[in-house]
């Protein structure tokens, strides 16, 4: 998700999910009392349940839903806050589902980029009470280019492979040929994006 602006803003990127939190790469603290996250723009309907702080360049958030495992791996800045919220604040008639969300909050930012991988992996068998492939396969995620025309990331997998993803920010024509040079390596492709080995 890329946002451009002519002034400084706070950006929140929410991931709404169903299920149970299994693991995070960051420490978080639970809020002692459930209070709304804000006063308007929908924030008045979100309870703030917990807050964590980004630290090492990536944040991972894993959960299980319907006996399947999922992980979000996000490239984050050390100043980003990681919020755990739940829908349902200021809802006296219980019209809202009490669904949880994971929010990456970036304060005092101009143009900004949120790079994330949402990964389904593995399953849980209730009959044998065993989990298969319950851990993420993504080791890291790095933004290596974020410009006006192109954005590019790399990510390393537990298999040892490194993947490369580049996107043309201003031209989604499937026939346009793009050329991008990064670290003395030239990438060329047609269409809005390139997904390749690195």
Task: Please place each PLM-identified region on the residue numbering.
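Short, surface-exposed linear segments at secondary-structure transitions and domain or protein termini
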Residues: 20-26, 81-84, 94, 169-182
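Non-cytosolic beta-sheet module surface loops
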Residues: 2-5, 106-108
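Acidic (Asp/Glu-rich), glycine- and aromatic
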Residues: 3-33
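Short glycine-aromatic motifs
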Residues: 19-27, 34, 82, 135-138, ...
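Trp/Gly-enriched beta-strand surface patches
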Residues: 33-98
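Short, hydrophobic/aromatic-enriched beta-strand segments in well-ordered soluble domains
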Residues: 15-17, 71-76, 80, 84-87, ...
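Extended repeat-based interaction scaffolds and adjacent low-complexity, acidic/S/T/P-biased segments
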Residues: 11-16, 39-42, 47, 57, ...
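Non-catalytic terminal regions with compositionally biased, polar/charged low complexity
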Residues: 101-113, 118-198
